[in-house]
Regions:
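N-terminal targeting/anchor module and adjacent flexible "hinge" preceding the catalytic domain
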Residues: 1-123, 130, 134, 147-156, ...
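Cytochrome P450 substrate-recognition site 1
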Residues: 74-94, 99-194, 198, 218, ...
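Conserved cytochrome P450 K-helix E-x-x-R motif and the immediately C-terminal K′/meander segment
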Residues: 90-111, 293, 390-432
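Cytochrome P450 heme-thiolate monooxygenase catalytic core
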Residues: 146-152, 156, 190-360, 376
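Cytochrome P450 heme-thiolate "Cys pocket" and heme-binding signature region
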Residues: 160-161, 177, 181, 346, ...
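Cytochrome P450 heme-binding "Cys pocket" and the immediately downstream C-terminal segment
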Residues: 371-374, 442, 493-530
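Conserved cytochrome P450 K-helix/beta-meander segment immediately N-terminal to the heme-binding cysteine loop
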Residues: 444-471
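C-terminal helix/juxtamembrane-tail motif
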Residues: 530-550
Length: 550
């Protein structure tokens, strides 16, 4: 066995590592061998250089008298770039309040990976699908681990398992075994009647607003609508959100929404701020305790069966998630421990309605801002025999192809999710030659991936028909990730899509939506998700519908 010295181009040759190389090794195997020594994530990008000359054969590499430089995708290794920032404050005032616009500016300046520092916390951002796929993969390089600096660190909840817990825990393994069946495609189908009853129950409120000739702010009503369904299906609770026009959101809904806003404020100020015994950090802790108390109370009150059921059968028959969690049994007779039921349900409740209410708001935004969308959606409903009494199910939804494209395009251009971060497990070299230290928090920036001009033709244009194009059908893996991707992607995506694809047809068929207030639509930079703050619309009862397309 012979040996050769290798070093990372961009570093001193004096740091070269001597590596034993087996005889008769081919170039691909040599790349993998070198990658293992230097923690290079993707061996395919490795090249070899001596004195500015690229070496393309193993014999040339092994016969070199000089140490061999390693390039990554033709580049020398380098640190991740980013703005320098101010002492202590870092880049806070370069990022906030318009973090979407400012991050786009930084991507344009620094490229597909950059870092920012806010009040001592360093965070990395990428709009590159290749890097995002690596980051989202639970691997030797990355995992979901909520350390200081992670956007969810102040509300980390080990007992929850999903969303707010680390992957490398028994709690996550247990929750990930029991919860996904309740959110699978078959399980979600049997939630459809409750979802439909929820939106139909809201009609009396929207009808009254129409009779008053009154405009309304979309997000607060979509928050009430989304959470009304989640309250019934997860906790077995009726939040009574549509008993009147001015019915207030249930305390649990307000507390969860408050906690997401407070968490964003706390994380933007750095990890030290989260430890303060007063102010927003204390309010955040108090909100979490109150939410836990209310969920425990709802668990005791929720309608529950008495017979244990197999996971899949329980998912298809349980009245609500409380019922499911108590009765579901795996093939070894194990159940979700009673003391681990409350925390996952808190997460399922909060994540369930905050995401769908934001998405519903953007879907209505599209109806009143982008010409022709509302008319095409309505025509598709009419062409499929839709009327006031139509029962929406998965079979009907599958026929509504324009609805599917409209939802996809809304999730591309106006995706509510913002910070699905992961943490590096080791020092590594990423594609592009970026050196990333261990315990780095990396955020695949979904909004900026979905609006990346290198991935999408004219991404600023809202165009549902792009989803019929060959380019979009053959788009790079990782270029459309509305619910993230990988083992820790959102487990509730089937639920969310079923909900919005049930609510929106019912609303569009009954009402004609128009924009009631001119001016730019603003988002709340201090909320965990991207939602429109000042979208006011009128919803007028339809009195006529178009004829079926001949």
């Amino acid at each position: 066995m012979t040996s050769q010295k290798f070093y990372l181009l961009g570093e001193s040759p004096s740091l070269a590592e001597e590596i034993d190389v087996p005889p008769h090794i081919d170039e691909e195997s040599l790349r993998h061998l070198v990658a293992s020594y230097f923690a290079i994530v993707d061996p395919k990008g490795i090249g070899f250089v001596v004195q500015d000359v690229c070496l393309t054969t193993v014999s040339d590499i092994m016969s070199s008298d000089d140490a061999v430089g390693i390039t990554i995708d033709g580049k020398a290794v380098r640190g991740v770039p980013g703005p320098q920032g101010l002492p202590y404050i870092g880049n806070y005032f370069e990022v906030y309040p318009d973090h979407l616009g400012n991050h786009q500016r930084l991507f344009e300046k620094y490229g597909p990976l950059f870092k920012t520092t806010n009040m001592g916390s360093v965070v990395y951002h990428t709009n590159d699908p290749t890097l995002s796929n690596i980051v989202f993969g639970e691997s030797d390089f990355f995992t979901k681990k909520l350390i200081e600096g992670h956007p969810l660190y102040p509300i980390k909840n080990k007992e929850a398992g999903v969303f707010l817990g680390d992957t490398d825990t028994e709690e996550w393994k247990t929750a990930h075994k029991f919860l996904p069946p309740a959110f699978g495609p078959k399980a979600v189908r049997h939630y459809a009647p409750t979802m439909q009853m929820t939106v139909e129950d809201s009609f009396k409120v929207f009808d009254e607003l129409d009779e008053r000739d009154e405009a309304w702010n979309v997000y607060p009503y979509m928050l009430k609508l989304g959470s009304q369904a989640v309250g019934k299906l997860v906790l077995g609770m009726d939040f009574k959100h549509f008993t009147s026009v001015d019915a207030p959101p249930h305390e649990m809904v307000m507390r969860i929404a408050e906690s997401l806003s407070l968490n964003k404020k706390v994380t933007s100020m750095g990890s030290w701020y989260a430890m303060l015994p007063f102010g927003d950090p204390k309010r955040l802790r108090d909100a979490r305790w109150r939410i836990a108390d209310m969920v425990n109370e709802s668990i005791e009150r929720a309608s529950k069966g008495v017979v244990n059921l197999d996971l899949q059968e329980a998912a298809l028959t349980a009245e609500n998630m409380v019922d499911y969690c108590i009765r579901a049994t795996d093939n070894k007779g194990n159940k979700l421990p009673r003391d681990r039921i409350m925390e996952p349900l808190v997460v399922a409740t909060g994540a369930g309605f905050t995401t769908t209410s934001s998405l519903l708001s953007w879907l209505i935004y599209g109806l009143v801002v982008y010409p022709g969308m509302q008319e095409r959606l309505l025509q598709e409903l009419v062409d499929n025999g839709f009327d006031e009494g139509t029962k929406i199910d998965a079979d009907l939804i599958n026929k509504l192809t324009f609805l599917d494209k409209y939802v996809k395009e809304t999730q591309r251009k106006h995706n509510p999710s913002y910070q699905p971060a992961r943490t590096s497990k080791v020092d590594m070299i990423l594609p592009g030659g970026y050196k990333l230290p261990k315990d780095s928090v990396v955020i695949p920036a979904i909004h900026h991936i979905h609006n990346n001009t290198e991935l999408w033709d004219n991404p600023a244009r809202f165009d549902p028909d792009r989803w019929d194009s060959e380019k979009v059908k053959t788009r790079p893996n990782g270029s459309y990730i509305p619910f993230a991707t990988g083992p820790r992607m959102c487990i509730g995506f089937n639920f969310a899509l079923m909900e919005v694809k049930t609510f929106l047809p019912k609303l569009v068929y009954r009402y004609r939506f128009t924009l009631a207030k001119d001016g730019p639509i603003e988002y709340d930079p201090m909320f965990q998700l991207i939602r429109p703050n000042n979208l006011y619309v009128r919803a007028e009862r339809r009195v006529k519908w178009p004829p079926k397309t001949e």
